[in-house]
């Protein structure tokens, strides 16, 4: 497809398609062209695409003609602007309405307008119609703002990337077969809709996304539904090309988006129909099954370690066909209700044709699920609060009043004689609390400091209401006047409260909480309740007891939100027959945990459980106290309680009263109100861990008590007896997965399972839980999907263009967007898009964002990142220095390890290229021979790109001037907060004096608790908004790095480059080549597939794996466990005395006996590769996390040369730690080369092992000196 408009990109297109070498000159010329391209040029380039008929479909004209907004809103009895609900109680999203009548034109861009100032002013004065218009205008604008950058940039990058035609895959030795843009339906729709809206106007973009806000085209055909629609179309257009999605499925996705735009509310329609693709593909697959293979995994004991073993494959046959009940009726009803019957019918027809579980069938599921809308859903804060915080659970079997004792302060104890199932809840929490309080570490001052510090962050925490509540009792707080920090942070709060007694701060426990919002993809927006410091403080016993339950009593894998942090093999195991899994989710979990049932029982249980171990002791700065005890009728006594119990008393008062939620809706002028709610606060440190503990405890009660009492079906009884929460029920928060292990006889009968599930639903109703149960032959856990042991990445949940913008703050200044763009690239890697197409598109996208106009002094200048910066950040080259194309894999690490890897792969080529291009010198270098690499790397901007990539991409705000007195007062207050226990301070002081004797001079700036107050101060500064000067300073620093000429890479990279390897034979595959493990990673996607089968999948929890590579698992917020770890390892490596290690551990707060024991262990213990490599800041790249990198380090990388030992490759006896670094270097090369991961042998260390080791030791000694 030759486009006249794109000719200026010609050389760049050839270089990212592997036809010519990539070079920085070509890259920067293209970046200039990208920045000169106007929005209208993008539409002209679209006009040139000769779309074929199969890309077209009827666009309903109703998407352009929408009613006025005023019939969709009203003012309620409390004088709040509210949305009228026409379609159902949850129809409170942005209505699809016309907008032109609310706009006033922009001064210079006259075709565009934004919400008229006159209307906003009338709204401020309380005019009802104007308030309604402003609410609609602002929330529609918010919906349009949920993108990373203007859509045209993403579209232009797609046009440029795809102009290179189909790509040659050197591994498969053929061209890929992805249809070109003329078959791209979403792109055609995008063009047609924009054409139709702009009509005769000279400007073609329907709306402008600018830093000042959103400007709408002044066209009568423009509606509020157009921005989310276009955002979805662009996402789909890019995915169709880069993931090789089936165009006919994408067309169905486009139809749903068009229906949503034609409906009365885009977001609402999307939310109601989001299940169409999964329901008719994933959840109804294989009703007949004729073959295929699934993995046979064994879950190793103890199960809580989450380690699995691959035992080969299991052939699938008809007996493993889907046995779960059919969803046909439900699916067709949904289709009829929303006018999508044809889409449902088409999907079901196609799903039935897949009777074999193989690469094609799972790719079909992935392609279909990728077609769901990926916008961030938006609604006003008022509606969110009134939707989410007004539900109260219906408890069918409440706890009888007579089963409680009289009050002990704020709590009552549940009597043993009660018949309520609450007694099991009480028992579990009581036991856990008693054991938690009996652990000596609970009372350790460091542990308490860690607990007190974990919520001291740069996030907000309802500070204004806290201050008001304290002023009300005449407590004045220090205001640290003139300090350049953001006051709305919990760091500032902690400093203000540091020296107040608990008797004062406890008043703030009942203070209002302010409001936070999160917008999500394919889920309702949530409101967040940021608790203040005293509220978080008294939640600690609740958190700690729940943590004890989750750690010792159930099977809860703690995991982060990124795909790579979740336990992928668990889903593989659960979904591989003969195992079966049931996805159990608790609907409205926060709202279902209230004082009426759960919290009253839990508070009493903890209060009584900790009693014997905590007598008289304060805890986390909360003193012991006395309460009235009327638990025995007619007797009133004073009962002394400990600090921990005192916390529970205050927390109970809060839970019993509920939370007072202060809503200040910035989208609706005049919507200011306080809402009382009993819903559990989403911002508490206890929320997630608490829900997990209740989830598992209630399930245990069901399996062991309630279930067996309520059925006499022998099969159901047998099933319940075989399940335990230590082995079969995995839960996190409100999400649960019941895993029914296959028996020797095969799968458990589906009818038995359904009977069991009906019982679970009935059981939940007794205490107000609505279990949302899905039993359909697939496993879904924490938003990961599996079928027959294969993960189905959900591409629609990682939108390429979308970005959550929950508040109206301005977007972050360039170059912070580059981190988001690299994030988009890595999401694509984790999701297994087509590797060559995705790398090519990512190069085009990065190029489009690599240049920025800036003011330098009085003149306009341009800041430009060289292409090498992106390589440093992890984007692999396509072809360079005369290499073959596509020899670099997307598994190339980031940073120095990645630079080492790609340079080592083509080092002889680079030397030859440099000499051929006239870069010759008489001085021979060890790495590049007679090539004048210094001059070359400066001229190609390779050095500049390398160094610019390491500079901050956010302006630095911690350099602001402040009077010394106030600054010291602030850090002293933070220090008092942290070192509230004098014993902690004396440990650190003792560590410091020991350090002076044994450690000084070995390494610089060892981590210490004394650094924390200053780090918190910096954190509170960095949370502030950057000034113009700070932005200019960042630009200036980048500019200087670009102009500077360099003579080398970093000392570490220069040392790495002395190591040479020999790549040898391919290994035996780790898994069967016929086995689909991740949809899209299949023989059509060569490099990721070959890496997966040669390295093998990761078969254990990555989080557990990395937790085992740390000496200290937890530390105070503000210190980094990795930094402590590398300091300890460096000391050991540099031959420090054991006493120096003890001193280091004392400085981070350990008690002497513990520090001494740990230091001894560190000196002697064998340390794993991943941990040892931290001494030079090497870490496992994120892109390797789904692969078995551990066995790669152990088995693929050989430190003994192929032809026997050499003097140069011998590792001196005292330098065993060098092996870890070498293993990383070798693995980096193996993973950076495309194709099968081969065995690699060490060949040469220039200058020998000892000299390399000494280089690293010198570096370790100097590191931190500059810090």
UniProtKB/Swiss-Prot annotation:
Keywords, ordered alphabetically: Capsid protein, Hydrolase, Nucleotide-binding, Nucleotidyltransferase, RNA-directed RNA polymerase, Transferase, Viral RNA replication, Virion
Domain RdRp catalytic: 555-792
Catalytic activity: RNA(n) + a ribonucleoside 5'-triphosphate = RNA(n+1) + diphosphate
InterPro entries: DNA/RNA_pol_sf (IPR043502), RdRP_5 (IPR012915), RNA-dir_pol_reovirus (IPR007097)
Protein's GO biological process: viral genome replication
Gene Ontology CC terms: viral nucleocapsid
Pfam family, one: RdRP_5
PROSITE patterns associated with the record: RDRP_DSRNA_REO (PS50523)
Compartment(s) where it occurs, according to its Swiss-Prot or TrEMBL record: Virion
Keyword rRNA-binding carried by entry: no
GO molecular function: hydrolase activity; nucleotide binding; RNA binding; RNA-directed RNA polymerase activity
EC number: 2.7.7.48
EC class name: transferase
Function: RNA-directed RNA polymerase that is involved in transcription and genome replication. Following infection, it catalyzes the synthesis of fully conservative plus strands. After core assembly, which consists in recruitment of one capped plus-strand for each genomic segments and polymerase complexes, the polymerase switches mode and catalyzes the synthesis of complementary minus-strands.
Family classification: Belongs to the reoviridae RNA-directed RNA polymerase family.
Protein name per UniProt: RNA-directed RNA polymerase lambda-3
Native source species: Reovirus type 3 (strain Dearing)
């Amino acid at each position: 497809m030759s486009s006249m408009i794109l000719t200026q990109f010609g050389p760049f297109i050839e270089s990212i398609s592997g036809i010519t070498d990539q070079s920085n000159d070509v890259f920067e010329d293209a970046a200039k062209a990208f920045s000169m391209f106007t929005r209208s040029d993008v539409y002209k380039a679209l006009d040139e695409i000769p779309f074929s008929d199969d890309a077209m479909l009827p666009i309903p004209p109703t998407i352009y003609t929408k009613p006025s907004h005023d019939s969709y809103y009203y003012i309620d009895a409390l004088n709040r602007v509210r949305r009228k609900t026409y379609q159902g109680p949850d129809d409170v999203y942005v209505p699809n309405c016309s907008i032109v009548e609310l706009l006033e034109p922009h001064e210079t861009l006259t075709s565009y307008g934004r919400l008229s100032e006159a209307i906003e002013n009338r709204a401020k004065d309380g005019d009802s119609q104007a308030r309604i218009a402003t609410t609609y205008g602002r929330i529609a604008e918010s919906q349009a703002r949920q993108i990373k950058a203007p859509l045209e940039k993403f579209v232009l990058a797609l046009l440029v990337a795809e102009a290179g035609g189909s790509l040659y895959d050197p591994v498969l030795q053929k061209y890929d077969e992805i249809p070109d843009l003329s078959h791209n339906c979403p792109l055609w729709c995008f063009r047609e809709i924009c054409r139709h809206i702009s009509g005769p106007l000279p400007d073609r973009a329907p709306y402008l996304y600018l830093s000042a806000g959103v400007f709408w085209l002044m066209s009568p055909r423009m509606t509020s539904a157009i921005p989310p629609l276009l955002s979805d179309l662009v996402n789909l257009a890019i995915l169709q090309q880069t993931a090789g999605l089936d165009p006919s499925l994408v067309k169905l996705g486009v139809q749903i988006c068009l229906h949503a735009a034609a409906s009365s509310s885009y977001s609402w329609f999307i939310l109601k129909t989001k299940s169409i693709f999964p329901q008719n593909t994933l959840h109804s697959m294989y009703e007949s099954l004729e073959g295929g293979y699934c993995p046979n995994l064994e879950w190793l004991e103890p199960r809580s370690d989450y380690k699995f073993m691959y035992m080969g494959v299991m052939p699938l046959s008809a007996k493993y066909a889907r046995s779960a009940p059919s969803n046909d009726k439900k699916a067709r009803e949904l289709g009829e209700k929303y006018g999508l019957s044809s889409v449902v019918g088409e999907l079901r027809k196609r799903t039935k044709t897949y009777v074999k579980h193989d690469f094609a069938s799972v790719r079909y599921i992935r392609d279909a699920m990728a077609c769901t809308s990926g916008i961030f859903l938006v609604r006003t804060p008022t509606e969110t609060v009134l939707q989410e915080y007004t539900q109260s659970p219906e408890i069918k079997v409440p706890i009888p009043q007579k089963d409680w004792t009289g009050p002990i302060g704020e709590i009552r104890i549940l009597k043993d004689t009660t018949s309520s199932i609450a007694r099991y809840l009480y028992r579990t929490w009581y036991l856990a609390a008693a054991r938690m309080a009996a652990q000596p570490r609970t009372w350790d001052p460091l542990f308490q400091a860690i607990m007190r510090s974990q919520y001291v962050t740069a996030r907000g925490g309802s500070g204004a209401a806290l201050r008001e509540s304290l002023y009300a009792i005449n407590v004045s707080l220090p205001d640290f006047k003139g300090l350049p920090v953001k006051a709305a942070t919990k760091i500032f709060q902690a400093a203000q409260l540091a020296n107040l007694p608990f008797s004062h701060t406890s008043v703030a426990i009942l203070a209002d909480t302010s409001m936070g919002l999160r917008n999500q993809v394919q889920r309702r927006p949530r409101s967040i309740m940021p608790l203040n410091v005293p509220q978080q403080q008294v939640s600690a016993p609740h958190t700690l007891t729940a943590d004890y339950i989750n750690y010792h009593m159930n099977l809860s894998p703690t995991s982060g939100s990124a795909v790579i942090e979740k336990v992928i093999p668990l889903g593989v195991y659960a979904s591989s027959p003969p195992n079966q899994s049931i996805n159990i989710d608790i609907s409205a979990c926060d709202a279902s945990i209230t004082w009426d049932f759960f919290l009253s029982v839990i508070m009493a249980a903890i209060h009584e459980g900790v009693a014997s171990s905590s007598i008289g002791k304060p805890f986390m700065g909360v003193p012991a106290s006395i309460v009235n005890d009327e638990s025995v009728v007619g007797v009133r006594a004073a009962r002394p309680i400990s600090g921990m119990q005192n916390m529970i008393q205050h927390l109970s008062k809060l839970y019993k009263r509920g939370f007072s939620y202060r809503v200040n809706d910035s989208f609706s002028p005049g919507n200011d109100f306080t809402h009382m709610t009993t819903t559990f606060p989403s911002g508490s440190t206890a929320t997630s861990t608490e829900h997990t503990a209740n989830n598992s405890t209630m399930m245990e009660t069901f399996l062991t008590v309630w279930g067996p009492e309520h059925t006499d079906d022998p099969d159901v009884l047998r099933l319940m007896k075989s399940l335990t929460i230590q082995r079969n029920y995995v839960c996190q928060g409100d999400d649960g997965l019941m895993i029914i292990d296959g028996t020797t006889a095969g799968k458990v009968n589906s009818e038995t399972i359904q009977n069991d599930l009906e019982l679970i639903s009935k059981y939940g109703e007794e205490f107000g839980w609505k279990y949302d149960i899905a039993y359909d032959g697939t496993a879904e856990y924490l938003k990961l999907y599996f079928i027959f042991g294969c993960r189905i990445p959900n591409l629609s949940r990682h939108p390429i263009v979308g970005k959550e913008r929950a508040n109206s703050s301005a977007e972050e200044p360039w170059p912070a967007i580059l981190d988001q763009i690299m994030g988009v690239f890595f999401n694509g890697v984790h999701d297994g898009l087509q590797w060559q197409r995705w790398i090519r598109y990512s190069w085009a996208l990065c190029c489009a964002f690599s240049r920025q106009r800036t003011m330098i002094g009085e003149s306009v200048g341009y800041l430009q990142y060289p292409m090498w910066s992106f390589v440093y950040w992890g984007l692999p080259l396509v072809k360079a220095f005369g290499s073959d194309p596509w020899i670099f894999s997307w598994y190339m690490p980031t940073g120095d390890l990645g630079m080492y890897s790609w340079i080592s792969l083509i080092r002889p080529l680079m030397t030859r290229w440099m000499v051929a291009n006239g870069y010759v010198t008489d001085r021979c270098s060890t790495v590049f021979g007679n090539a004048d690499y210094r001059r070359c790397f400066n001229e190609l901007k390779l050095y500049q790109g390398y160094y610019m990539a390491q500079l901050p991409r956010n302006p630095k705000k911690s350099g602001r001037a402040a009077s010394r007195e106030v600054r010291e007062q602030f850090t002293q207050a933070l220090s008092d907060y942290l070192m509230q226990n004098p014993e902690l301070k004396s440990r650190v002081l003792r560590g410091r004096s020991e350090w002076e004797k044994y450690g000084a001079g070995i390494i610089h700036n060892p981590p210490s608790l004394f650094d924390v107050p200053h780090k918190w101060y910096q954190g509170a500064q960095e949370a502030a908004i950057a000034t113009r000067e700070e932005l200019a300073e960042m630009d200036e620093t980048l500019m200087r790095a670009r102009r500077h000429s360099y003579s080398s890479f970093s000392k570490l990279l220069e040392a790495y480059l002395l190591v040479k390897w020999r790549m040898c034979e391919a290994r035996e595959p780790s898994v069967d080549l016929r086995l689909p493990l991740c949809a899209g990673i299949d023989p059509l996607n060569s490099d990721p597939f070959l890496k997966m089968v040669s390295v093998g999948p990761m078969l254990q929890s990555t989080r557990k794996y990395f937790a085992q590579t740390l000496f200290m698992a937890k530390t105070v917020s503000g210190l980094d466990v990795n930094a402590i770890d590398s300091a300890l390892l460096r000391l050991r490596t540099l031959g420090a005395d054991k006493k120096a290690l003890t001193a280091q551990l004392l400085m981070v707060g350990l008690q002497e006996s513990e520090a001494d024991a740990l230091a001894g262990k560190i000196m002697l213990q064998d340390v794993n590769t991943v941990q040892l490599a931290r001494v030079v800041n090497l870490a496992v790249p994120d892109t390797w996390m789904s692969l078995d990198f551990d066995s790669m380090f152990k088995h693929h990388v050989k430190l003994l040369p192929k032809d026997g030992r050499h003097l140069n490759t011998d590792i001196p006896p005292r330098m065993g730690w060098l092996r870890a670094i070498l293993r990383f270097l070798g693995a980096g090369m193996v993973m950076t080369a495309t194709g099968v991961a081969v065995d690699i042998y060490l060949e040469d260390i220039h200058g020998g092992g000892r000299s390399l080791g000494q280089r690293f030791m010198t570096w370790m000694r100097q590191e931190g000196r500059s810090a």
